[in-house]
């Protein structure tokens, strides 16, 4: 059975939220690619649309949009997802995962593309800040 940690990014505020999904909610992500848009019901955002922006497997290998399927592939990278060079011209062979989500993926990164007030929809409103404003 699939189980994922989903990191939800709100581009309007710059905040991120984490949710654990399993069972039927996790099955909605299986077989989807980076860039696919789906309904936010799986992560508790019923009136929102989310887009898959990336992820990583249980060993920390990043998913890359330019690698097809769910396979692992060794790439000689000059930069980008999976490698940040420390000097100009540096290249390194890195193992990355394909763009399709399967059971080996541990974390999925998503971004909200349609909808507003993600914090309120997830029930993570800042109650302490509201109390401070009233005083």
Curated annotation (Swiss-Prot):
GO biological processes: translation
InterPro entries tied to this protein: Ribosomal_eS6, Ribosomal_eS6_arc, Ribosomal_eS6_CS
SMART domains: Ribosomal_S6e
One GO molecular-function entry: structural constituent of ribosome
One Pfam family here: Ribosomal_S6e
GO cellular component term, pick one: ribonucleoprotein complex
Keyword tags: Ribonucleoprotein, Ribosomal protein
Family membership noted in the UniProt record: Belongs to the eukaryotic ribosomal protein eS6 family.
Protein name: Small ribosomal subunit protein eS6
């Amino acid at each position: 059975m699939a189980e994922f940690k989903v990191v939800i990014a709100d581009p309007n505020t710059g905040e991120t939220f984490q949710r654990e999904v399993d069972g039927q909610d996790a099955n909605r992500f299986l077989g989807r690619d980076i860039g696919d848009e789906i309904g936010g019901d799986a992560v508790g955002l019923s009136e929102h649309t989310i887009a898959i922006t990336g992820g990583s497997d249980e060993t920390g290998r990043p998913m890359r949009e330019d690698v097809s399927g769910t396979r692992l592939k060794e790439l000689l990278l000059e930069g980008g997802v999976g490698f940040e060079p420390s000097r100009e011209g540096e290249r390194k062979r890195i193992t990355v995962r394909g763009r399709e989500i399967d059971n080996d993926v541990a974390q999925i990164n998503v971004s909200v593309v349609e909808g507003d007030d993600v914090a309120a929809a997830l029930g993570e409103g800042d109650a302490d800040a509201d109390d401070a404003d009233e005083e």
